[in-house]
Amino acid sequence: MHGQNAQARVWPMLKVRHLVAGALLALVWSQTWYIRTIFPKAFFSVPREMPSWYIRGGESSASPSVTCTPIRSEYVADPQAYETNPSTSQHAQIADACEDLRMSDTLGAVFLSCDPGRKEWNVFMGPTANPASRGALWVLDYKTAPDALPVLVPMEGYPDSYDFHPHGMSLFVYDENHARMFVANERAAASTIEVLDLERSHEWRAQYVRTLQHPVGTHMPNALHAVGPHELYVSNSKLVSHRPPPRASYEAAIAAQLGNFLAPWLYVALTYRPLFHIFSFLDDLLGLGYVSHVRFTDDGDVTHSIFAQRISFANGVVVSGEQLYVAATGAAGIYVYDRHKKAASKRRTYVPLPFLPDNLALTVPSEHRTSPGVLAAGHPSLPDMHLYALYSTPARRAPSWVAEVWYNASSSTEHDEAGVPFPSDRAIPRLPYGWHVQTLFQSSGRHAPDVSAATTALWDPTPQGRGAFFVTSLYGPSPLLCKGMYS
Protein backbone atom coordinates (compact mmCIF):
# COMPACT_ATOMS: atom_id res chain seq x y z
CA MET A 1 0.00 0.00 0.00
CA HIS A 2 2.75 2.39 1.00
CA GLY A 3 4.70 1.41 -2.12
CA GLN A 4 1.71 2.19 -4.31
CA ASN A 5 1.30 5.62 -2.65
CA ALA A 6 4.99 6.42 -3.12
CA GLN A 7 4.79 5.36 -6.75
CA ALA A 8 1.70 7.52 -7.21
CA ARG A 9 3.58 10.52 -5.83
CA VAL A 10 6.75 9.94 -7.85
CA TRP A 11 5.06 9.37 -11.20
CA PRO A 12 3.61 12.91 -11.57
CA MET A 13 7.00 14.35 -10.55
CA LEU A 14 8.72 12.33 -13.26
CA LYS A 15 6.17 13.48 -15.81
CA VAL A 16 6.77 17.12 -14.84
CA ARG A 17 10.52 16.64 -15.14
CA HIS A 18 10.11 15.02 -18.54
CA LEU A 19 7.90 17.87 -19.67
CA VAL A 20 10.42 20.47 -18.49
CA ALA A 21 13.30 18.58 -20.12
CA GLY A 22 11.31 18.26 -23.33
CA ALA A 23 10.47 21.95 -23.32
CA LEU A 24 14.12 22.89 -22.84
CA LEU A 25 15.17 20.50 -25.60
CA ALA A 26 12.56 21.97 -27.94
CA LEU A 27 13.77 25.48 -27.09
CA VAL A 28 17.37 24.58 -27.87
CA TRP A 29 16.34 22.74 -31.06
CA SER A 30 14.37 25.77 -32.22
CA GLN A 31 17.52 27.85 -31.81
CA THR A 32 19.82 25.67 -33.95
CA TRP A 33 20.62 28.64 -36.18
CA TYR A 34 21.58 30.60 -33.07
CA ILE A 35 23.84 27.79 -31.87
CA ARG A 36 25.53 27.28 -35.25
CA THR A 37 26.05 30.98 -35.93
CA ILE A 38 26.66 32.47 -32.49
CA PHE A 39 28.17 29.54 -30.62
CA PRO A 40 31.73 29.92 -32.03
CA LYS A 41 31.82 33.65 -31.23
CA ALA A 42 30.21 33.27 -27.82
CA PHE A 43 32.17 30.30 -26.49
CA PHE A 44 35.50 30.06 -28.33
CA SER A 45 38.62 32.16 -28.70
CA VAL A 46 39.37 34.13 -31.84
CA PRO A 47 40.32 32.09 -34.95
CA ARG A 48 44.04 31.75 -35.66
CA GLU A 49 43.48 33.38 -39.04
CA MET A 50 42.69 36.70 -37.35
CA PRO A 51 45.63 39.00 -38.18
CA SER A 52 47.59 40.78 -35.49
CA TRP A 53 46.85 44.01 -37.33
CA TYR A 54 44.97 45.11 -40.44
CA ILE A 55 43.56 48.48 -41.41
CA ARG A 56 42.24 49.46 -44.79
CA GLY A 57 44.97 51.38 -46.63
CA GLY A 58 47.49 50.66 -43.88
CA GLU A 59 50.73 48.72 -43.59
CA SER A 60 49.21 45.40 -44.62
CA SER A 61 47.52 46.90 -47.69
CA ALA A 62 48.90 47.72 -51.11
CA SER A 63 49.26 51.48 -50.41
CA PRO A 64 50.46 52.12 -46.83
CA SER A 65 49.04 55.61 -46.39
CA VAL A 66 47.39 55.30 -42.98
CA THR A 67 49.15 56.19 -39.73
CA CYS A 68 47.69 55.27 -36.34
CA THR A 69 48.53 56.58 -32.87
CA PRO A 70 46.79 56.51 -29.48
CA ILE A 71 45.35 59.85 -28.40
CA ARG A 72 46.23 60.46 -24.77
CA SER A 73 44.57 63.13 -22.67
CA GLU A 74 46.16 64.88 -19.74
CA TYR A 75 45.09 64.13 -16.19
CA VAL A 76 42.48 66.55 -14.83
CA ALA A 77 42.16 66.68 -11.05
CA ASP A 78 38.80 65.43 -9.76
CA PRO A 79 38.30 63.99 -6.25
CA GLN A 80 35.43 61.81 -7.56
CA ALA A 81 37.48 60.24 -10.37
CA TYR A 82 38.44 56.57 -10.37
CA GLU A 83 42.02 56.88 -11.58
CA THR A 84 44.97 58.48 -9.79
CA ASN A 85 47.48 60.86 -11.36
CA PRO A 86 50.85 59.16 -10.80
CA SER A 87 52.60 62.55 -10.65
CA THR A 88 50.46 63.95 -7.83
CA SER A 89 48.90 60.82 -6.28
CA GLN A 90 45.56 62.66 -6.50
CA HIS A 91 42.37 61.35 -8.08
CA ALA A 92 42.00 62.63 -11.64
CA GLN A 93 39.98 62.10 -14.79
CA ILE A 94 41.62 60.70 -17.91
CA ALA A 95 40.16 59.76 -21.30
CA ASP A 96 40.34 55.99 -20.82
CA ALA A 97 37.63 53.30 -21.03
CA CYS A 98 35.69 55.44 -23.51
CA GLU A 99 32.80 53.14 -24.44
CA ASP A 100 31.24 55.51 -26.97
CA LEU A 101 32.36 58.24 -29.35
CA ARG A 102 30.12 60.56 -31.36
CA MET A 103 31.31 62.62 -34.32
CA SER A 104 29.71 65.70 -35.85
CA ASP A 105 30.87 67.02 -39.20
CA THR A 106 29.10 70.32 -38.45
CA LEU A 107 30.83 70.74 -35.09
CA GLY A 108 34.14 69.41 -36.40
CA ALA A 109 34.51 67.54 -33.15
CA VAL A 110 34.41 64.08 -31.59
CA PHE A 111 32.89 63.67 -28.13
CA LEU A 112 34.02 60.84 -25.86
CA SER A 113 32.06 59.08 -23.10
CA CYS A 114 34.64 57.68 -20.67
CA ASP A 115 34.38 55.84 -17.37
CA PRO A 116 37.58 54.20 -16.02
CA GLY A 117 35.52 53.06 -13.01
CA ARG A 118 33.72 50.59 -15.27
CA LYS A 119 36.19 47.99 -13.96
CA GLU A 120 34.14 48.00 -10.76
CA TRP A 121 30.72 49.14 -12.02
CA ASN A 122 29.09 47.74 -15.15
CA VAL A 123 25.35 47.03 -15.07
CA PHE A 124 25.47 45.11 -18.38
CA MET A 125 28.28 42.64 -17.75
CA GLY A 126 29.24 43.15 -14.12
CA PRO A 127 30.76 43.65 -11.70
CA THR A 128 28.46 45.93 -9.73
CA ALA A 129 30.76 46.36 -6.76
CA ASN A 130 31.54 50.06 -6.47
CA PRO A 131 29.55 52.89 -8.09
CA ALA A 132 31.22 55.64 -6.02
CA SER A 133 33.50 57.13 -8.69
CA ARG A 134 32.44 59.33 -11.61
CA GLY A 135 33.20 59.19 -15.30
CA ALA A 136 33.49 62.20 -17.59
CA LEU A 137 32.88 63.60 -21.07
CA TRP A 138 35.69 64.73 -23.36
CA VAL A 139 35.95 66.48 -26.72
CA LEU A 140 38.52 66.41 -29.50
CA ASP A 141 38.55 69.05 -32.26
CA TYR A 142 39.84 66.72 -34.93
CA LYS A 143 39.31 69.08 -37.89
CA THR A 144 40.62 72.46 -36.76
CA ALA A 145 43.44 71.11 -34.59
CA PRO A 146 44.66 67.80 -36.04
CA ASP A 147 47.24 67.28 -33.27
CA ALA A 148 44.98 68.30 -30.40
CA LEU A 149 44.43 66.15 -27.32
CA PRO A 150 41.04 65.32 -25.78
CA VAL A 151 39.83 68.11 -23.50
CA LEU A 152 37.52 67.58 -20.52
CA VAL A 153 34.01 69.00 -21.00
CA PRO A 154 32.89 70.76 -17.78
CA MET A 155 29.34 69.84 -16.70
CA GLU A 156 27.69 72.89 -15.18
CA GLY A 157 24.66 72.47 -12.94
CA TYR A 158 24.89 68.69 -12.67
CA PRO A 159 23.69 67.76 -9.16
CA ASP A 160 26.51 66.85 -6.78
CA SER A 161 24.40 64.05 -5.30
CA TYR A 162 24.06 62.26 -8.67
CA ASP A 163 26.58 59.62 -9.67
CA PHE A 164 27.75 59.67 -13.29
CA HIS A 165 28.69 56.54 -15.24
CA PRO A 166 28.38 57.57 -18.91
CA HIS A 167 27.79 54.90 -21.52
CA GLY A 168 26.16 55.52 -24.91
CA MET A 169 25.43 59.04 -26.11
CA SER A 170 23.96 61.00 -29.01
CA LEU A 171 24.07 64.53 -30.38
CA PHE A 172 21.35 66.71 -31.87
CA VAL A 173 23.22 69.57 -33.55
CA TYR A 174 21.73 73.07 -33.82
CA ASP A 175 24.68 74.86 -35.44
CA GLU A 176 28.48 74.79 -35.42
CA ASN A 177 28.64 76.01 -31.82
CA HIS A 178 25.53 74.54 -30.19
CA ALA A 179 24.15 71.03 -29.73
CA ARG A 180 22.06 68.96 -27.35
CA MET A 181 23.67 65.83 -25.93
CA PHE A 182 21.94 62.78 -24.49
CA VAL A 183 24.01 60.44 -22.29
CA ALA A 184 23.01 57.03 -20.91
CA ASN A 185 23.98 56.99 -17.23
CA GLU A 186 24.47 53.68 -15.36
CA ARG A 187 23.55 55.09 -11.96
CA ALA A 188 23.65 53.04 -8.78
CA ALA A 189 19.90 53.09 -8.11
CA ALA A 190 18.56 52.95 -11.68
CA SER A 191 19.71 53.85 -15.18
CA THR A 192 18.81 57.27 -16.56
CA ILE A 193 19.46 59.50 -19.56
CA GLU A 194 21.06 62.87 -18.88
CA VAL A 195 20.15 65.81 -21.12
CA LEU A 196 22.92 68.38 -21.60
CA ASP A 197 23.15 71.50 -23.76
CA LEU A 198 26.57 72.01 -25.34
CA GLU A 199 27.96 75.43 -26.21
CA ARG A 200 31.31 76.49 -27.62
CA SER A 201 32.67 79.96 -27.03
CA HIS A 202 36.41 79.45 -26.61
CA GLU A 203 35.96 75.92 -25.28
CA TRP A 204 33.10 73.46 -25.07
CA ARG A 205 30.92 73.48 -21.97
CA ALA A 206 27.89 71.34 -21.04
CA GLN A 207 24.90 72.74 -19.17
CA TYR A 208 22.78 70.19 -17.33
CA VAL A 209 19.14 70.41 -18.44
CA ARG A 210 17.34 67.46 -16.87
CA THR A 211 17.30 63.72 -16.22
CA LEU A 212 15.05 61.35 -18.18
CA GLN A 213 13.80 58.27 -16.38
CA HIS A 214 11.07 55.84 -17.38
CA PRO A 215 10.59 52.30 -16.02
CA VAL A 216 10.37 50.83 -19.53
CA GLY A 217 11.86 53.47 -21.81
CA THR A 218 15.12 53.74 -19.84
CA HIS A 219 15.18 50.31 -18.19
CA MET A 220 18.71 49.41 -19.37
CA PRO A 221 19.70 52.15 -21.86
CA ASN A 222 22.80 51.29 -23.83
CA ALA A 223 22.91 53.27 -27.08
CA LEU A 224 20.99 56.40 -28.08
CA HIS A 225 20.11 58.22 -31.29
CA ALA A 226 18.49 61.64 -31.09
CA VAL A 227 16.11 62.65 -33.87
CA GLY A 228 15.12 65.95 -32.25
CA PRO A 229 15.82 68.06 -29.17
CA HIS A 230 12.99 66.25 -27.33
CA GLU A 231 12.95 62.87 -29.06
CA LEU A 232 15.31 59.91 -29.27
CA TYR A 233 15.57 56.17 -29.81
CA VAL A 234 17.00 54.12 -26.95
CA SER A 235 18.30 50.56 -27.10
CA ASN A 236 17.53 48.68 -23.88
CA SER A 237 19.97 45.79 -24.06
CA LYS A 238 18.35 43.28 -21.74
CA LEU A 239 15.44 42.68 -19.43
CA VAL A 240 17.57 40.88 -16.82
CA SER A 241 19.81 43.36 -15.02
CA HIS A 242 22.99 42.91 -12.98
CA ARG A 243 21.76 45.83 -10.89
CA PRO A 244 18.00 45.45 -10.44
CA PRO A 245 16.15 48.80 -10.44
CA PRO A 246 13.47 49.51 -7.82
CA ARG A 247 10.79 46.80 -7.73
CA ALA A 248 7.97 48.88 -9.24
CA SER A 249 10.18 49.88 -12.18
CA TYR A 250 11.48 46.35 -12.71
CA GLU A 251 7.97 44.87 -12.69
CA ALA A 252 6.82 47.50 -15.20
CA ALA A 253 9.65 46.53 -17.56
CA ILE A 254 8.86 42.83 -17.13
CA ALA A 255 5.16 43.45 -17.75
CA ALA A 256 5.90 45.36 -20.95
CA GLN A 257 7.73 42.33 -22.34
CA LEU A 258 6.03 39.32 -20.75
CA GLY A 259 2.67 40.46 -19.39
CA ASN A 260 1.23 41.81 -16.14
CA PHE A 261 0.32 38.43 -14.67
CA LEU A 262 3.89 37.10 -14.68
CA ALA A 263 5.60 40.32 -13.61
CA PRO A 264 5.44 39.90 -9.78
CA TRP A 265 6.54 36.28 -9.96
CA LEU A 266 9.32 36.91 -12.43
CA TYR A 267 10.61 39.80 -10.36
CA VAL A 268 11.25 37.39 -7.49
CA ALA A 269 12.92 34.89 -9.82
CA LEU A 270 15.08 37.41 -11.68
CA THR A 271 16.39 38.95 -8.46
CA TYR A 272 17.37 35.56 -7.02
CA ARG A 273 21.15 35.83 -7.39
CA PRO A 274 22.04 32.09 -7.56
CA LEU A 275 20.02 31.81 -10.78
CA PHE A 276 21.00 35.16 -12.28
CA HIS A 277 23.39 33.83 -14.94
CA ILE A 278 20.83 31.29 -16.15
CA PHE A 279 18.17 33.98 -16.58
CA SER A 280 20.68 36.31 -18.23
CA PHE A 281 21.54 33.60 -20.78
CA LEU A 282 17.84 32.94 -21.45
CA ASP A 283 17.37 36.69 -21.91
CA ASP A 284 19.85 36.65 -24.79
CA LEU A 285 18.56 33.36 -26.19
CA LEU A 286 14.95 34.56 -26.28
CA GLY A 287 15.87 38.09 -27.37
CA LEU A 288 14.30 40.21 -24.64
CA GLY A 289 16.16 43.38 -25.59
CA TYR A 290 14.20 46.16 -27.28
CA VAL A 291 14.32 49.69 -28.69
CA SER A 292 12.28 52.45 -27.11
CA HIS A 293 11.04 55.63 -28.73
CA VAL A 294 11.23 58.26 -25.99
CA ARG A 295 9.75 61.75 -26.11
CA PHE A 296 9.65 64.42 -23.43
CA THR A 297 8.45 67.97 -22.90
CA ASP A 298 9.97 70.96 -21.15
CA ASP A 299 7.26 70.56 -18.50
CA GLY A 300 8.77 67.27 -17.39
CA ASP A 301 6.51 64.67 -19.05
CA VAL A 302 8.28 61.60 -20.46
CA THR A 303 6.40 59.32 -22.84
CA HIS A 304 7.56 56.05 -24.31
CA SER A 305 6.63 53.42 -26.86
CA ILE A 306 8.39 50.20 -27.83
CA PHE A 307 9.61 50.63 -31.40
CA ALA A 308 11.16 47.17 -31.86
CA GLN A 309 11.56 44.13 -29.65
CA ARG A 310 12.78 40.52 -29.59
CA ILE A 311 16.39 41.67 -30.03
CA SER A 312 19.17 39.60 -28.51
CA PHE A 313 21.19 42.13 -26.48
CA ALA A 314 20.06 45.29 -28.26
CA ASN A 315 23.09 47.53 -28.59
CA GLY A 316 24.10 50.28 -31.04
CA VAL A 317 21.32 52.22 -32.72
CA VAL A 318 21.44 54.78 -35.55
CA VAL A 319 18.94 56.37 -37.92
CA SER A 320 19.78 56.99 -41.56
CA GLY A 321 17.00 58.38 -43.71
CA GLU A 322 13.92 56.17 -43.35
CA GLN A 323 15.83 53.27 -41.80
CA LEU A 324 16.70 52.49 -38.21
CA TYR A 325 19.65 50.16 -37.60
CA VAL A 326 20.05 48.16 -34.38
CA ALA A 327 23.08 46.08 -33.46
CA ALA A 328 21.92 42.74 -32.08
CA THR A 329 25.03 41.67 -30.21
CA GLY A 330 23.56 38.31 -29.21
CA ALA A 331 22.55 37.57 -32.82
CA ALA A 332 25.85 38.67 -34.42
CA GLY A 333 24.22 41.06 -36.84
CA ILE A 334 22.24 44.22 -37.52
CA TYR A 335 18.47 44.52 -37.78
CA VAL A 336 17.20 47.16 -40.21
CA TYR A 337 13.71 48.62 -39.77
CA ASP A 338 11.53 51.08 -41.63
CA ARG A 339 10.99 53.51 -38.78
CA HIS A 340 7.76 54.99 -40.11
CA LYS A 341 5.80 51.74 -40.35
CA LYS A 342 3.34 50.79 -37.66
CA ALA A 343 4.38 48.11 -35.20
CA ALA A 344 1.84 45.62 -36.55
CA SER A 345 3.32 45.79 -40.06
CA LYS A 346 6.94 46.36 -39.06
CA ARG A 347 9.34 43.96 -40.76
CA ARG A 348 13.07 43.78 -40.28
CA THR A 349 16.03 42.82 -42.42
CA TYR A 350 18.81 40.86 -40.77
CA VAL A 351 22.36 41.60 -41.94
CA PRO A 352 24.80 39.05 -40.44
CA LEU A 353 28.25 40.14 -39.27
CA PRO A 354 31.44 38.15 -38.59
CA PHE A 355 31.57 39.42 -35.01
CA LEU A 356 29.31 40.42 -32.13
CA PRO A 357 28.53 44.06 -32.93
CA ASP A 358 28.63 46.70 -30.22
CA ASN A 359 28.05 50.33 -31.19
CA LEU A 360 27.02 51.69 -34.58
CA ALA A 361 27.85 55.02 -36.20
CA LEU A 362 27.22 56.75 -39.51
CA THR A 363 30.12 57.65 -41.77
CA VAL A 364 30.46 61.19 -43.06
CA PRO A 365 29.19 61.30 -46.69
CA SER A 366 31.90 61.88 -49.29
CA GLU A 367 32.14 62.62 -53.00
CA HIS A 368 32.31 58.88 -53.71
CA ARG A 369 29.22 58.02 -51.67
CA THR A 370 26.49 60.58 -51.07
CA SER A 371 24.63 58.55 -48.44
CA PRO A 372 26.40 57.51 -45.24
CA GLY A 373 27.34 53.95 -44.50
CA VAL A 374 26.92 52.32 -41.10
CA LEU A 375 30.05 51.48 -39.12
CA ALA A 376 29.87 48.53 -36.75
CA ALA A 377 32.59 47.77 -34.22
CA GLY A 378 32.62 44.65 -32.12
CA HIS A 379 34.01 41.44 -30.73
CA PRO A 380 35.02 38.32 -32.70
CA SER A 381 35.27 36.40 -29.41
CA LEU A 382 33.13 36.93 -26.32
CA PRO A 383 35.35 34.79 -24.02
CA ASP A 384 38.43 36.80 -24.98
CA MET A 385 36.57 40.02 -24.17
CA HIS A 386 35.45 38.71 -20.77
CA LEU A 387 38.97 37.56 -19.89
CA TYR A 388 40.34 40.95 -20.91
CA ALA A 389 37.79 42.65 -18.66
CA LEU A 390 38.89 40.46 -15.74
CA TYR A 391 42.63 40.50 -16.42
CA SER A 392 43.51 43.67 -18.31
CA THR A 393 47.14 42.84 -19.11
CA PRO A 394 49.17 42.60 -22.35
CA ALA A 395 48.85 38.82 -22.07
CA ARG A 396 45.06 39.08 -21.87
CA ARG A 397 43.99 41.22 -24.78
CA ALA A 398 40.83 40.86 -26.83
CA PRO A 399 40.42 40.98 -30.61
CA SER A 400 38.50 43.65 -32.50
CA TRP A 401 36.72 43.93 -35.84
CA VAL A 402 35.26 47.00 -37.56
CA ALA A 403 33.21 46.83 -40.75
CA GLU A 404 31.16 49.20 -42.86
CA VAL A 405 27.66 48.08 -43.86
CA TRP A 406 25.63 49.59 -46.67
CA TYR A 407 22.95 48.76 -49.23
CA ASN A 408 23.48 49.01 -52.98
CA ALA A 409 21.64 46.50 -55.14
CA SER A 410 23.36 47.69 -58.33
CA SER A 411 26.93 46.89 -57.27
CA SER A 412 28.67 43.55 -56.77
CA THR A 413 30.07 42.31 -53.47
CA GLU A 414 32.89 40.46 -55.23
CA HIS A 415 35.67 42.91 -54.34
CA ASP A 416 34.37 44.23 -51.01
CA GLU A 417 36.86 42.16 -49.00
CA ALA A 418 39.81 42.24 -51.39
CA GLY A 419 43.08 42.26 -49.46
CA VAL A 420 41.49 41.48 -46.09
CA PRO A 421 43.52 38.75 -44.30
CA PHE A 422 40.45 37.14 -42.76
CA PRO A 423 37.49 38.18 -44.96
CA SER A 424 34.04 38.39 -43.48
CA ASP A 425 32.50 35.86 -45.88
CA ARG A 426 34.49 33.12 -44.13
CA ALA A 427 32.67 33.76 -40.88
CA ILE A 428 29.10 34.62 -41.88
CA PRO A 429 26.32 33.09 -43.99
CA ARG A 430 25.23 34.64 -47.26
CA LEU A 431 24.29 38.32 -47.08
CA PRO A 432 20.78 39.46 -48.04
CA TYR A 433 20.47 40.72 -51.59
CA GLY A 434 22.00 44.16 -52.10
CA TRP A 435 23.80 44.38 -48.76
CA HIS A 436 27.55 44.88 -48.45
CA VAL A 437 29.92 44.27 -45.52
CA GLN A 438 33.46 45.61 -45.90
CA THR A 439 36.16 45.14 -43.26
CA LEU A 440 37.99 48.32 -42.27
CA PHE A 441 39.91 47.14 -39.22
CA GLN A 442 40.98 43.83 -37.68
CA SER A 443 43.22 43.14 -34.73
CA SER A 444 44.10 40.33 -32.38
CA GLY A 445 44.61 43.00 -29.69
CA ARG A 446 48.29 42.25 -29.22
CA HIS A 447 49.83 44.76 -31.61
CA ALA A 448 50.86 48.30 -30.65
CA PRO A 449 49.46 50.83 -31.28
CA ASP A 450 46.19 49.06 -30.73
CA VAL A 451 42.84 48.80 -29.01
CA SER A 452 41.38 45.75 -27.31
CA ALA A 453 37.70 44.75 -27.48
CA ALA A 454 36.58 47.59 -29.75
CA THR A 455 33.17 49.07 -29.01
CA THR A 456 32.93 52.11 -31.31
CA ALA A 457 34.45 53.26 -34.59
CA LEU A 458 34.05 56.61 -36.35
CA TRP A 459 35.18 57.58 -39.82
CA ASP A 460 35.43 60.87 -41.68
CA PRO A 461 36.77 59.86 -45.12
CA THR A 462 36.80 63.42 -46.49
CA PRO A 463 39.92 65.54 -47.16
CA GLN A 464 38.58 68.13 -44.73
CA GLY A 465 38.50 65.46 -42.03
CA ARG A 466 41.95 64.19 -43.07
CA GLY A 467 40.56 60.68 -43.40
CA ALA A 468 40.22 60.42 -39.62
CA PHE A 469 39.31 56.98 -38.30
CA PHE A 470 38.73 56.46 -34.56
CA VAL A 471 38.46 53.18 -32.63
CA THR A 472 37.84 52.86 -28.92
CA SER A 473 37.10 50.12 -26.41
CA LEU A 474 35.10 49.30 -23.31
CA TYR A 475 37.92 48.90 -20.80
CA GLY A 476 41.01 49.80 -22.76
CA PRO A 477 43.31 52.80 -22.65
CA SER A 478 43.05 55.89 -24.82
CA PRO A 479 41.26 55.69 -28.19
CA LEU A 480 43.17 55.05 -31.38
CA LEU A 481 43.22 57.71 -34.11
CA CYS A 482 44.23 56.78 -37.65
CA LYS A 483 44.78 59.45 -40.31
CA GLY A 484 44.79 59.20 -44.08
CA MET A 485 41.98 56.65 -44.42
CA TYR A 486 40.11 58.13 -47.38
CA SER A 487 37.18 56.59 -49.18
Provide a role label for each language-model segment.
Residues 36-97, 147-156, 205-209, 301-302, ...:
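A short helix->beta-strand "capping" segment at the edge of beta-propeller domains
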Residues 32, 36-42, 46, 320, ...:
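Loop/turn-rich, solvent-exposed surfaces of beta-rich toroidal or solenoidal domains
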Residues 127-144, 190-202, 251-297, 391-411, ...:
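Beta-propeller blade signature
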